[in-house]
């Protein structure tokens, strides 16, 4: 089941055991970016009315 290369996701990225860690970091960063985008997008009309 496990090859001599060690634990990997099998995505062909050559990251080995760091693959899941890197994907997790990228996923969290993407979620934070999307949250900030939607939060700022929804806040724009209120900011425009205040001017």
Swiss-Prot record:
<protein>
    <recommendedName>
        <fullName>Magnetosome protein Mms5</fullName>
    </recommendedName>
</protein>
<keyword id="KW-0472">Membrane</keyword>
<dbReference type="GO" id="GO:0110146">
    <property type="term" value="C:magnetosome membrane"/>
</dbReference>
<feature type="topological domain" description="Lumenal">
    <location>
        <begin position="1"/>
        <end position="12"/>
    </location>
</feature>
<feature type="transmembrane region" description="Helical">
    <location>
        <begin position="13"/>
        <end position="33"/>
    </location>
</feature>
<feature type="topological domain" description="Cytoplasmic">
    <location>
        <begin position="34"/>
        <end position="51"/>
    </location>
</feature>
<keyword id="KW-0091">Biomineralization</keyword>
<comment type="function">
    <text>Might be involved in magnetite crystal growth.</text>
</comment>
<keyword id="KW-1133">Transmembrane helix</keyword>
<keyword id="KW-0812">Transmembrane</keyword>
<keyword id="KW-1281">Magnetosome</keyword>
<comment type="similarity">
    <text>Belongs to the magnetosome MamD/Mms5 family.</text>
</comment>
<feature type="region of interest" description="LG region">
    <location>
        <begin position="9"/>
        <end position="16"/>
    </location>
</feature>
């Amino acid at each position: 089941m496990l090859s001599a290369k060690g634990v990997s996701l099998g995505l062909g990225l050559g990251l080995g055991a760091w693959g899941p860690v890197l994907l997790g970091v990228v996923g969290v960063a993407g979620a934070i970016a999307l949250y900030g985008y939607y939060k700022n997008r929804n806040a724009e009309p209120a900011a425009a009315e205040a001017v």
